[in-house]
From Swiss-Prot:
Superkingdom as given in the UniProt entry: Bacteria
Organism: Synechocystis sp. (strain ATCC 27184 / PCC 6803 / Kazusa)
Organism lineage string: Bacteria, Bacillati, Cyanobacteriota, Cyanophyceae, Synechococcales
Cross-referenced SUPFAM superfamilies: FAD-linked reductases, C-terminal domain, FAD/NAD(P)-binding domain
Name recorded for this polypeptide: L-amino acid dehydrogenase
GO CC, alphabetical: plasma membrane-derived thylakoid membrane
Catalytic activity: a plastoquinone + an L-alpha-amino acid + H2O = a plastoquinol + a 2-oxocarboxylate + NH4(+); a plastoquinone + L-arginine + H2O = a plastoquinol + 5-guanidino-2-oxopentanoate + NH4(+)
Binding site for Mg(2+): G31, G34, A283
Primary site of residence: membrane
Entry note: cofactor: Binds 1 FAD per subunit.
């Protein structure tokens, strides 16, 4: 659901000619991983066809411009210093970056109290700590060291094969939190990380495997500052730039319903046609790949896997103001807390526009209660929470956008998919293994930076490389 008006889509539907119905490789899905796979194959003169269910490109990489000229990324938006594949892509397309606004005091709201502090929650806490009780703070930090040590013992390439993996995968993250934190703040802090920071979901701690959370931290650590920078013009401009290299090789608005394969090739059936190729790459989240029927059927472990990997629960809120008023108060525009709806918010303003933009999120169990309310009540709830962080000016935005990812039938949630208990060790071996002529891509299967754009790029590159080796 989107509440907006007067905006320009950064990745609108392409005006494309009818592509050839036969090619070297068919790519299902035009998210970043699918587009990268198609581009890399095309660059070495293999013919490709990208088939997308939606009427637009990009999947979770999707943006718009406000009437003020400020861009907003309705999907992912940040990049970090160790996300080398994403940084290489930005450099290739001459997309400029700027530091995520962070100057000033951050705000922690906990149990009705407000704390301003000059530090960062990036892995091990850095800088000045919030002035909560030392017992509560020490509880969270001691537990964090235990969590980090446990995560470092994992093999990020093969989490299903790590030492004691069965034991870790049999527990929820909530089990670990209960055992390792002893104060209300410690309990909330780790629950918040699971919901707001995500470690892939976001999910409630009771829903996600401890093994999966640990793997997410090892693969995509907040300690590497993945939200260090934003992009001038937004990440949503990237799909169109890649698509420009693919010419008439993209079909939009054609959901794939069936893929057949034999020893000669594949046939992909959409709601309106059939297309032949030598190989296929399915570049969607696992649950969407599971909606497609296959002939011959997928192996049992693959079929079982796609039934068990849900998307995280997240609605992104983008609220713009005539100026970043919080800076006048010495605030950074970054807040976290156990408020009614908004546990995390961040300044996403482009310094070249003068407009103030706050990105925030309603996640986990909060989402179900919030989305059931009326539009006006939802808006008031979000703005009231932002006022607790930044002051009464937050109640009067210029624009207010709800990006309801769980309602998107061809996405189904955000930020990414997660593994409930038992899934990694019972079915994880089927996550990325090709099945005959069908290969997989998507940020969920990345061994490094899973859940981020960088992970999506890595899997698109890997899938294309594998296909090139077979053609």
């Amino acid at each position: 659901m989107v509440i907006r008006s007067g905006k320009t889509n950064l990745n609108p539907p392409c005006a494309l000619m009818a592509p050839s119905s036969s090619c070297d490789c068919i790519i299902v899905g035009s998210g970043l991983s699918g587009l990268i796979a198609a581009r890399n194959l095309s660059r070495v003169n293999y013919s490709v066809l990208v088939i997308e269910a939606q009427e637009r490109l990009g999947g979770r990489m999707y943006g718009e411009y406000l009437p003020s000229g400020q861009w907003i990324d309705r999907g992912g938006q940040w990049v970090g210093p160790t996300q080398d594949r994403f940084l290489a892509l930005l450099n290739e397309y001459n997309i400029e970056r700027f530091p995520s606004p962070a100057d000033g005091l951050k705000v922690l709201l906990f149990d009705g109290k407000r704390y301003e502090f000059d530090g960062f929650f990036q892995g091990v806490f850095q800088g000045e700590a919030p002035k909560i009780s030392s017992d509560e703070w020490n509880d969270a930090m001691v537990a964090w060291e235990k969590f980090n040590t446990l995560a470092q013992s994992l093999d990020e390439q093969h989490p299903e094969a790590t030492p004691e993996n069965k034991k870790l995968d049999s527990q929820t993250f909530a089990d670990w939190i209960k055992e390792n934190t002893h104060t209300a703040f410690g309990h909330w802090y780790f629950s918040y990380m699971c919901r707001a920071v995500g470690f892939l979901g976001p999910a409630e701690p009771s829903q996600v495997s401890l093994l999966h959370i640990l793997w997410g931290h090892k693969s995509a650590s907040q300690g590497e500052n993945p939200e260090a920078e934003l992009l001038h013009g937004g990440a949503g401009q990237i799909p169109q730039k890649i698509a420009a290299e693919l010419g008439n090789s993209i079909l939009l608005g054609e959901p794939v319903i069936h893929i057949a394969q034999d020893d000669k090739g594949v046939e992909v059936t959409t709601t309106t046609g059939k297309y032949q190729g030598k190989f296929a790459i399915v570049a969607t989240p696992p649950h969407l790949a599971g909606r497609i029927t296959y002939s011959p059927p997928m192996p049992p472990l693959r079929q079982q896997l796609t039934q068990r990997v849900p998307m995280g629960t997240c609605c992104k809120l983008l609220i713009s103001y005539d100026r970043p008023f919080w800076r006048e108060k010495g605030l950074a525009g970054i807040g976290l807390g156990n408020t009614t709806w908004i546990e995390l918010c961040a300044d996403s303003s482009d310094p070249t526009t003068g407009v103030g933009v706050i990105a925030s999120f309603v996640v986990g169990d909060r989402y179900g209660k919030w989305i059931a309310m009326g539009e006006a009540e939802r808006r008031q709830g979000v703005l009231s929470d932002l006022a607790l962080y930044f002051g009464e000016e937050a109640l009067s935005p210029e624009t207010y956008d709800e990006v309801d990812w769980p309602s998107e039938q061809w996405v189904g949630g955000g930020y990414a998919a997660f593994m409930p208990p038992g899934v990694w060790t019972s079915f994880g071996q089927a996550l990325s293994a090709p099945v005959g002529r069908i290969h997989w891509a998507g940020t969920e299967i990345a061994p490094r930076w899973a859940g981020f754009f960088d992970g999506a790029i890595r899997t698109g590159e890997a899938a294309a490389k594998a296909i090139i080796g077979l053609l």
